[in-house]
């Protein structure tokens, strides 16, 4: 997260002003994702699938979230994998706002990874950076997500086949930016009529893509675990409360 401290403070002031306006529930999460959410859109189904993948590898899997920020996605994973950990390169995001850093988040970069882990989750890679080879050295499986308009969606460069991994699965999650037009309606002018909303819904193109890469010896186990989950247990009605903003 390559921000100067003064930029963070300016953003935080804008965030506080927005909160003082008593906005609709969960809107701050998507308008100010740095402070209240994550840089990528996710739903409960994404968390559950990630956990299923980890448990297909081991009964007690090791898991690291690389570039976890304040740990929004990581905290959801930890509800099911209590030993999951995160790493964050920029400690200033905690110190600048006197936010207590959880013990399960270590201040380090992906280049400093040394311990082997069952699953590495990569939800953010700064523009121009490429730390995949460091992740590949330590992880047995990599789950990564990126949006269609980001550096990975446009230019690729987020695949792991060149490091000896095989792509096991992929899916997509509708992203917020073109799902709920009101989120980008800064002054909350009157809502669009139903007909206009239906027209806009047909134009939805922004998505977060999720890709799963694994060492060849693990692909069959992960595929089997995911297929079992999809057929037997996945419930489309099992959602986080903030998902109401996405639909």
Task: Please provide the spans of the model-predicted regions.
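Core SAM-dependent methyltransferase catalytic element
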Residues: 190-247
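S-adenosyl-L-methionine
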Residues: 1-57
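Conserved acidic residues
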Residues: 61, 118-119, 140
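Short amphipathic alpha-helix with an adjacent loop that forms part of the alpha/beta core around
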Residues: 54, 106-115
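A short SAM/SAH-binding and catalytic strip from SAM-dependent methyltransferases
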Residues: 118-130
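Class I SAM-dependent methyltransferase SAM/SAH-binding core
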Residues: 72-104
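C-terminal substrate-binding/active-site "lid" region of AdoMet-derived donor-dependent transferases
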Residues: 127-214
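Conserved class I S-adenosyl-L-methionine
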Residues: 60-69
């Amino acid at each position: 997260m390559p921000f100067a401290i003064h930029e963070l403070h300016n953003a935080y002031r804008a965030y506080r002003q927005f909160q003082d306006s008593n906005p609709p529930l969960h809107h701050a999460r998507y308008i100010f994702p740095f402070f209240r959410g994550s840089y990528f859109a996710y739903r409960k189904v994404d968390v559950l699938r990630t956990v299923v993948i980890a448990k297909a590898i081991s009964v007690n899997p090791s898991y690291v979230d690389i570039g976890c920020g304040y740990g929004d996605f990581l905290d959801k994973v930890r509800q099911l994998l209590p030993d999951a950990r995160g790493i964050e390169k920029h400690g200033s995001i905690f110190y600048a706002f006197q936010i207590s850093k959880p013990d399960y988040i270590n201040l380090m970069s992906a280049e400093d990874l040394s311990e082997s882990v069952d699953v590495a989750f990569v939800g953010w890679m700064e523009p121009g950076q490429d730390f995949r080879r460091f992740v590949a050295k330590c992880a047995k499986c990599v789950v990564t997500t990126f949006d269609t308009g980001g550096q990975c969606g446009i230019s690729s460069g987020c695949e792991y086949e060149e490091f000896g991994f095989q792509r096991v699965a992929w899916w997509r999650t509708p992203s917020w930016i073109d799902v709920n037009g009101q989120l980008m309606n800064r002054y909350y002018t009157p809502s669009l009529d139903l007909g206009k909303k239906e027209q806009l819904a047909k134009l939805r193109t922004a998505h977060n893509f999720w890709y799963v890469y694994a060492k060849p010896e693990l692909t069959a186990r992960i595929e089997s675990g995911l297929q079992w989950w999809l057929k037997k247990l996945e419930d489309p009605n099992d959602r986080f409360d903030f998902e109401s903003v996405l639909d």
